[in-house]
From Swiss-Prot:
Subcellular location: Cellular thylakoid membrane
Subunit description: The PsaA/B heterodimer binds the P700 chlorophyll special pair and subsequent electron acceptors. PSI consists of a core antenna complex that captures photons, and an electron transfer chain that converts photonic excitation into a charge separation. The cyanobacterial PSI reaction center is composed of one copy each of PsaA,B,C,D,E,F,I,J,K,L,M and X, and forms trimeric complexes.
Gene name of the encoded protein: psaB1
Single Gene Ontology MF annotation: chlorophyll binding
Annotated EC: 1.97.1.12
PROSITE patterns the UniProt entry points to: PHOTOSYSTEM_I_PSAAB
GO CC aspect terms: photosystem I; plasma membrane-derived thylakoid membrane
Record Pfam families: PsaA_PsaB
Name used for this protein in its record: Photosystem I P700 chlorophyll a apoprotein A2 1
Lineage: Bacteria, Bacillati, Cyanobacteriota, Cyanophyceae, Nostocales
Function: PsaA and PsaB bind P700, the primary electron donor of photosystem I (PSI), as well as the electron acceptors A0, A1 and FX. PSI is a plastocyanin/cytochrome c6-ferredoxin oxidoreductase, converting photonic excitation into a charge separation, which transfers an electron from the donor P700 chlorophyll pair to the spectroscopically characterized acceptors A0, A1, FX, FA and FB in turn. Oxidized P700 is reduced on the lumenal side of the thylakoid membrane by plastocyanin or cytochrome c6.
Family the UniProt entry places it in: Belongs to the PsaA/PsaB family.
GO biological process: photosynthesis
Cofactor note: PSI electron transfer chain: 5 chlorophyll a, 1 chlorophyll a', 2 phylloquinones and 3 4Fe-4S clusters. PSI core antenna: 90 chlorophyll a, 22 carotenoids, 3 phospholipids and 1 galactolipid. P700 is a chlorophyll a/chlorophyll a' dimer, A0 is one or more chlorophyll a, A1 is one or both phylloquinones and FX is a shared 4Fe-4S iron-sulfur center.
Bilayer disposition of the protein: Multi-pass membrane protein
Length: 741
């Protein structure tokens, strides 16, 4: 007899109901719970999946290069990047009639195509790509790389090539390898590519596989490097009149510290970027030699964590906080590690979103407004999922892996002991932010509706304006630090009366970029609305994690695992309080918050791009302004994507907008009606099926049963999330592309 799905759990495989399928899907990635799983096998499986993950990433990148080279217009786009729309790929659809074919034949193509809003054209152009042949070459190289990684994944599952558990637990070796090998050497390699290929190409000098070994990136060669005269590499930078990809106005410098933007491309100077990556490489290669491995030299992380002295002075531990036992706790819990990694990656992803538009590093991307909007929104959405995931795995760690004995008296136990104070402070700040921010918005709404807008309560963000002024923004007249030519920040060593980054002050005071945008009362209000969302999301997640092991209401909570619906009907108050429930609830708040973040960013930028900042400034101070002048006004083109007169090139976004709403609304069916309703419905359908001629010839092996409450919630949450993302993505791209192409 064939073994039934799932193979990883005999208990589930023998379940006579449809639970077998749903629980198997839920537990598929929970390797720890699989039959016969050992700790060593767990690490080996996860290690092998990393290779598969990398293979998928390389395959994806390869497919982008391949489709653009095959069906795109890269070579045409290069000639006029400000006006030619980049093509992602062709579309073939048997449903297209003549009007649709005409609508989607755009950007100089011969047939229907999709426009690229990912920024890959700008990226490839900046790093030195110039021809379709180069794109094809890159595509084939990445395809081979992906194959290599797939093979490596398979190889590391073979008995002879499976690393031992001790190898996985060697934290210092892994840290050295990741710091020096991955971060350090890859940054050095990237600096090398920029210096040897990208910078010469930006100056009109071709560097390819045919001549890269014979073309020196700097006229002085390596002599300044070996003689310690490194300043030579910064002399003679590109001039303000440099035309990108030509020799006109170009210099010879390869490592500079100019600051600001290239006047024509409005992106960071390539020579500054190369300098940055070289510095990162040096730092990380040094950092990758700091930890003690086989040679008995360097730091032992365990000793540092357990230390009670700091340069001879007695302390509680690192940062004068007791970290005893943390090393083993961290090193023996994959969930603890994953929680940290997701938290760090989440912060970095949000940080990337903020920097991609304010300090654009790719040529001309600052003027591709739809791409800017898409990239910002994409990275902020990714960030919230990573952050919520961090708390989820932190809670799983506390339920499954936390050992109270091992962590006696250290910072982990200290946080758990102070959980009431932490949770109540988060609650207080959420209530304060919520009532005050909503109160201000509603007050302003009412007075505007009554025809007395001058009675609005408008608060200038003076502290934020002060910070901007300190960085050199002179508009506010606050005369402090870099905005005051007589201050020590302005006149400081090494170059008196000449700011360290000559291009910085020009950039921060230019009205045409997104660096340190001018802010006022509308920004003050939406900032606090976003702060409310962030603090409430954090409250739900922190409470869920800190109460995951037990609460006053349910002291034995940890015995029920990470996700459970209730402890039976006889124990009141135990429903909806598992750590999983806090993850589930927090995601609604996280989505809510990222909505406000992206609404704010998009509306503010639409005004800047259209040269009409007054609309945001005047109408963002009351709720109706947001509803009417941002959401309603910008959905007009979207709703008109197709109408009785035919279709236009926004119609695909109009359909996606509708479809997104449909998916989103479907979520509520699972979120509002729970198990009893569905069980009755299923029983009725089964009864009808069994009594219907012909239909009753078909039977099923599994008895149909309704989803559990937790499963229904996850299905509802998935629909809510996917619908939310699709709806806003369509709105964002159509409303921006409809205005700017």
């Amino acid at each position: 007899m064939a073994t039934k799905f799932p193979k990883f759990s005999q208990d589930l495989a023998q379940d006579p109901t449809t639970r077998r399928i749903w629980y198997a899907m839920a537990m598929g990635n929970d390797f720890e719970s699989h039959d016969g799983m050992t700790e060593e096998n767990l690490y080996q499986k996860i290690f092998a999946t990393h290779f598969g993950h990398l293979a998928i990433i390389f395959l994806w990148a390869s497919s982008l290069l391949f489709h653009v080279a095959w069906q795109g217009n890269f070579e045409q786009w290069i000639k006029d990047p400000l006006h030619v729309r980049p093509i992602a790929h062709a579309i073939w659809d048997p449903h297209f009639g003549k009007p649709a074919i005409e609508a989607f034949t755009q950007a100089g193509a011969n047939g229907p195509v999709n426009i690229a809003y990912s920024g890959v054209y700008h990226w490839w152009y900046t790093i030195g790509m110039r021809t379709n042949t180069e794109l094809y070459t890159g595509s084939v190289f990445l395809l081979l790389f992906a194959s290599l990684f797939l093979f490596a994944g398979w190889l590391h599952l073979q008995p002879k090539f499976r690393p031992s558990l001790a190898w996985f637990k060697s934290a210092e070796s892994r840290l050295n390898h990741h710091l020096a090998g991955l971060f350090g050497v890859s940054s050095l390699a990237w600096a090398g590519h920029l210096i040897h290929v990208a910078i010469p190409e930006s100056r009109g000098q071709h560097v390819g596989w045919d001549n890269f070994l014979t073309t020196a990136p700097h006229p002085a060669g390596l002599q300044p490097f070996f003689t310690g005269n490194w300043g030579v590499y910064a002399q003679n930078p590109d001039t303000a009149g440099h035309i990108f990809s030509t020799s006109q106005g170009s210099g010879t410098a390869i490592l500079t510290f100019l600051g600001g933007f290239h006047p024509q491309t409005e992106s960071l100077w390539l020579t500054d970027i190369a300098h940055h990556h070289l510095a990162i490489a040096v730092l990380f290669i040094v950092a990758g030699h700091m930890y003690r491995t086989n040679f008995g030299i360097g730091h032992s992380i365990k000793e540092m964590m357990n230390a009670k002295t700091f340069f001879g002075k007695p302390v509680e531990g690192p940062f004068n906080m007791p970290h005893q036992g943390i090393y083993d706790t961290y090193n023996n819990s994959l969930h603890f590690q994953l929680g940290w990694h997701l938290a760090c990656l989440g912060v970095v992803t949000s940080w990337v979103a903020q920097h991609m538009y304010s300090l654009p590093s790719y040529a001309f991307i600052a003027k591709d407004y739809t791409t800017q909007a898409a990239l910002y929104t994409h990275h902020q959405y990714i960030a919230i999922f990573l952050m919520v995931g961090a708390f989820a795995h932190g809670a799983i760690f506390l339920v499954r892996d936390y050992d109270p004995e091992q962590n006696k008296g250290n910072v982990l136990e200290r946080v758990l002991q102070h959980k009431e104070a932490i949770i109540s402070h988060l609650s207080w700040v959420s209530l304060f932010l919520g009532f005050h921010t909503l109160g201000l918005y509603v007050h302003n709404d009412v007075v505007v509706a009554f025809g007395t807008p001058e009675k609005q309560i408008l608060i200038e963000p003076v502290f934020a304006q002060f910070i901007q002024a300190a960085h050199g923004k002179v508009l506010y007249g606050l005369d402090t630090l870099l905005s005051n030519p007589d201050s020590v920040a302005y006149t400081a060593y090494p170059n008196y009366a000449n700011v360290w980054l000559p291009g910085w002050l020009d950039a921060i005071n230019s009205g045409t970029n997104s660096l340190f945008l001018t802010i006022g009362p509308g920004d003050f209000l939406v900032h606090h609305a976003i702060a409310l969302g962030l603090h409430t999301t954090t409250l739900i997640l922190v409470k869920g994690a800190l109460d995951a092991r037990g609460s006053k209401l349910m002291p034995d909570k940890k015995d029920f695992g990470y996700a459970f619906p209730c402890d039976g009907p006889g124990r009141g108050g135990t429903c909806d309080i598992s750590a999983w429930d806090s993850f589930y609830l927090s995601l609604f708040w996280a989505l809510n918050t990222v909505g406000w973040v992206t609404f704010y960013w998009h509306w503010k930028h639409l005004g800047i791009w259209q040269g009409n900042v007054a609309q945001f400034n005047e109408n963002s101070t009351y709720l109706m302004g947001w509803f009417r002048d941002y959401l309603w006004a910008n959905s007009a083109q979207l709703i008109n994507g197709y109408n009785p007169y035919g279709v236009n090139n926004l119609s695909v976004w109009a359909w996606m907008f509708l479809f997104g709403h449909l998916v989103w609304a479907t979520g509520f069916m699972f979120l509002i009606s729970w198990r009893g309703y569905w069980q009755e419905l299923i029983e009725t359908l089964v009864w009808a099926h069994e009594r219907t001629p012909i239909a009753n010839l078909i039977r099923w092996k599994d008895k149909p049963v309704a989803l559990s409450i937790v499963q229904a919630r996850v299905v509802g949450l998935a629909h809510f999330t996917v619908g939310y993302v699709l709806t806003y993505a369509a709105f964002l791209i159509a409303s921006t592309a409809g205005k700017f192409g």
